[in-house]
Amino acid sequence: MDTVNSERLAVLYARIALGVAFLSAVADRFGLWGKYGGWKNFATFTDYTAQVNSFMPAFIIPFLAWAATAAELALGIGLIVGFWPRWVALSAAILLFLFGTAMAISFGIKSPLDYSVFSASAAAVLLAVYQGPKSGANS
């Protein structure tokens, strides 16, 4: 397999892996994973949002839960479909970085490291860089 095809497959794999991960998390919030889900319903996810964002005022927690859900749904679809790939990947990287930072503040640094949140954010940054404008003979 040549380098160009290998790179394209790697980018496609990263887009699909990140996109499906976002959509899986959203599906779990609405009970679509059934007994295999962690949250199983939106109320439980909202409680988790409050724990992760323990430094935020209580009145903003429902907004954060819905905003995260809407962002993850849009980013998941955008990554899989390939819509505005650079900007969607960069947005995913920022969202994951913010989530990891909130986890670190509320639970300690081990939590986002154990769940590979910063690793996923870094993968999204790499994806954004690869999706940028190309120049040169092999682009």
What are these regions (language model features)?
Residues 1-42, 51-70, 74, 81-139:
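Extended, low-polarity transmembrane helix blocks
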